[in-house]
Amino acid sequence: MFYSPLDQFEIKPLLMVNNILTLALTNYTLYLIIVVSIIFGYTSIISNGRLGSTRWGVAIIAIYDTILNLVYSQIGKAGGHFFPLIFTIFNLIFAANLISMIPYSFAISAQLVAIVSFSLALWIGNVILGLYLHGWGFFALFVPSGTPLPLVPILVLIEALSYSSRAISLGLRLGANILSGHLLMLILGSLIVNLMSSSILGFIGGIVPIVAVIAITILEVGIAIIQAYVFSILLSGYIKDSVSLH
């Protein structure tokens, strides 16, 4: 039987309930519940001040301060209003990416339809925020200052297309990185297993590639963390555009 490397991203029902409505608990839903539960426990520890001086406490405080500084450096004084949102989203992506690195787990960040829909919702929220704060003046964002009048229609079209592309690119960047990383690890791992199970010589020759796979896995863990941070940076920048129109 042939197994595709993409099978690991297939959404499968784990529990079906057929009544008036058909309800299904899928692997995507299960891991999403796990991630959200971790976020609730994580935030409750912070809000109740039970961090202490343990290594976990120091790590949580470091993450908190990092995102807080990021938000204020990107958005400015108004950043405090948006910090809870960005901090929650960072931790959601951070936890989801790390859980996906566990063998036989499920990568919810690699579901392109879901993650792009999420970024689209955030983009729509940014547009609504800009219209709420500035009214029709929000569309001045699409006209660069000092633009010659004859070039205004062309630049407005370019800026509008660039701004609209954020709705897809924000989530697509995250999903594509996680998807490609997991595919690479699975393909290399499968090749090494086949090589080492072929013969004694193949078993000996497969030891060196194992070291490479371990190195790639460590790199993927770093990328998983960086992608959560990059998502937060970009979202903060988009909110800044809606708040200050530049």
Curated annotation (Swiss-Prot):
SUPFAM superfamilies tied to this protein: F1F0 ATP synthase subunit A (SSF81336)
A cellular component annotation (GO) from this entry: proton-transporting ATP synthase complex
Propeptide regions on this chain: 1-3
GO molecular function: proton-transporting ATP synthase activity, rotational mechanism
Annotated compartments: Mitochondrion inner membrane
PROSITE patterns: ATPASE_A
Transmembrane segments annotated in the record for this chain: 20-40, 56-76, 82-102, 112-132, 138-158, 176-196, 203-223
Protein's UniProt keywords contain Mitochondrion: yes
UniProt GO BP: proton motive force-driven ATP synthesis
Keyword Transcription regulation: no
Annotated keywords: ATP synthesis, CF(0), Hydrogen ion transport, Ion transport, Membrane, Mitochondrion, Mitochondrion inner membrane, Transmembrane, Transmembrane helix, Transport
Membrane-related topology note: Multi-pass membrane protein
PANTHER family: ATP SYNTHASE SUBUNIT A
Function: Mitochondrial membrane ATP synthase (F(1)F(0) ATP synthase or Complex V) produces ATP from ADP in the presence of a proton gradient across the membrane which is generated by electron transport complexes of the respiratory chain. F-type ATPases consist of two structural domains, F(1) - containing the extramembraneous catalytic core and F(0) - containing the membrane proton channel, linked together by a central stalk and a peripheral stalk. During catalysis, ATP synthesis in the catalytic domain of F(1) is coupled via a rotary mechanism of the central stalk subunits to proton translocation.
Family: Belongs to the ATPase A chain family.
Oligomeric and partner information: F-type ATPases have 2 components, CF(1) - the catalytic core - and CF(0) - the membrane proton channel. CF(1) has five subunits: alpha(3), beta(3), gamma(1), delta(1), epsilon(1). CF(0) has three main subunits: a, b and c.
Protein name: ATP synthase subunit a
Gene source species: Candida albicans (strain SC5314 / ATCC MYA-2876) (Yeast)
